[in-house]
Amino acid sequence: MIFLLSVEQEYDELNHVMKIFQDTMMRLRYSAIPVVAAPHGYTLGGGCELCLQCDAVVPYSETYIGLVEAGIGLLPGGGGMKEMILRASDKFKKNDVEVNILQEYFMNIGMGKTATSGFEGYELDYFIKGRDITVMNKKNQINIAKQKALNLFDAGYTKPIERNDIKVLGKQALGMLYVGVDSLRAGDYISDHDKKIANKIAYVLCGGDLSQPTKVSEQYLLELEREAFISLCGERKTLERMQYMLKNGKPLRN
């Protein structure tokens, strides 16, 4: 659907579809009852974004999870960017070099890094230590996930409050990420289109070109994410990547 709407340049309809996708993810995140995901196998792109919104995740050990949208010329558009920014913000501490923390997320998303197991997912911050549970026996996965949801409910689960205190770093950090992208292009490690995608990812991660670090809402970040996603859908080379993936099942480097 995304590819067809992009080819036909139906950008208003595309915006509508992506807004529904984001709203669905937010309803999942702010459900009145606990939501637990039990991923296994390939959990990529939108599947990963869905897991990021849940109250807990119970992955099977053989779970391959990641935000891989850059490989088809896009960026995560269903709340994945928003959630990564939120998690980075929660890691910021006084006197930290905050841009270094943000850069890790930038590299993960820009390079489409995929965790190759239900254990590596913690290192990439797709899963959260102390909250999520990786299971070795797939036969037990659903039962453990169900028990996790029941435990959350029995502990007095309450509907989360939508966040409006997410710290974004603005144009100073954005400039530093841009310099890094320029260096990669100058070294011929990435293509011109890779550079364009990376710059869009950097822009969203930094909350835009705000003059100084600022605390923003989830809705603000979702709008930035959606605008950047749709703008990339209008790029010819993105369409070529999407078409190639649909036809051949592997990414195109252009």
Describe each model-derived feature in a short phrase.
Residues D55-G77, D125-Q141:
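Gly/Pro- and small hydrophobic-enriched strand-loop and loop-to-helix capping segments
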Residues D12-V35, Y42-C48, A88, D96-Q103:
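Phosphate/diphosphate-binding loops
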Residues Y30, A38, S61, G71, ...:
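Active-site-adjacent scaffolding segments
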Residues M26-I72:
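Glycine-rich beta-to-alpha active-site loop
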Residues L86-S117, E123, I128-N254:
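Intrinsically disordered, low-complexity segments enriched in small/flexible residues
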Residues M1-I20, G73:
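Glycine- (often His-adjacent) and acidic-residue-rich active-site loop
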